[in-house]
Amino acid sequence: MRKISLISIAMLIVSIPTFAGGLLTNTNQHPAFLRMLSRGANTTSVDAALSNPAGLAFLPKDGFYTSLSIQSAFQTRNIDASCEALGLDKYYEGKASAPVIPSVFAAYKKGDWTISGFFGITGGGGKASFDDGLSMFDAMVIGGLLQQGIPGKAYTLNSYMDGKQYIYSVQLGLTYKITDWLSAFAGGRMNYFTGGYKGALNASAAVDLPMPTGGAIPVGTELIGIDLDCSQTGWGFTPVIGLDAKFGKLTIGAKYEFKANLNIENNTKVNSLRMIGAPESELEDYKHGVNTPNDIPAMLSVAAAYEFLPVLRASVEYHFYDDKNVGMAGGKQKFLTKGTNEYLDRKSTRLNSSH
């Protein structure tokens, strides 16, 4: 019984990244995205340095182009969990926040050549806090203690978890205008991952509990305890290539980002797993110095835009993320059947040149 409970707790902690945001791609890197979701065929503004870098060859005139934007994102993640068999009926409230999401774009165009750069947060889920723990905490612990004959009303359970994940990226590249209608881009992006988890769990006896070997477990005795304080860092490189073609009022942009091999390394200050009757141990995945694969998947972007009028434009865009062929913690990619498909479409009215 004790072995099963220990495994349950370990599984519980491993699943926490899902609630901290996981390895997500942040598509929105510029306020213009809120007006037009499909940016992959953009050739008129500097944010194309990320969404359609080959299209920078068709910027209106030679010279420097720069853009700095700061956005904020806040979200509540609430869970209403109940399980009659486990005696679980509780409402959990979590708060996720990314108060500062900076993006910097720059490009210099001279004739047929354009050099461009970008800095921003391209992945991660920001910060998430669950002050009353997670339903998984309670369910796993309740299940483990029930297997040892300890009913839910016989103990009190307290837990909390804070998590954060960010991927900071710097991209540089060169665009060349091959013909009057075709251009190409080649460059690369350096990605730096920083994140971590800090939390605690304590299940203690609420009444005197009988021991199988005789005697009793006094009120207040810790039955299960977890303390974790682990920060994680890592880096990886993403090669990027792109093409852009203009056929009158029709623009087609394509970009391919190769897979970035990224391993994150633990810098663990606290890692304690305790269960009554067993020696103190550690959570294997969060031991100091352990490396975990968290690759950034290859991504294909294809977009088309058509300008009906000088003030009216329609665009569509397709993204494919090859999640199946990357390295993930615990080999999670083996359970995927395919990658992720994303579709964006939008009609846009350009009100003035200040956008």
Regions found by a protein language model. Give the residues of each.
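Residue-level signature of outer-membrane beta-barrel architecture
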Residues: 107-110, 176, 190, 241-247, ...
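Residues that define the transmembrane beta-barrel architecture of outer-membrane proteins
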Residues: 47, 97-102, 166-170, 233-239, ...
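Outer-membrane beta-barrel channels and translocator barrels
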Residues: 61, 110-113, 179-181, 247-250, ...
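Conserved small/polar residues in nucleotide/adenosyl-binding loops
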Residues: 345-355
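N-terminal, post-signal peptide beta-strand-biased segments of exported outer-membrane/organellar beta-barrel
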Residues: 16-124
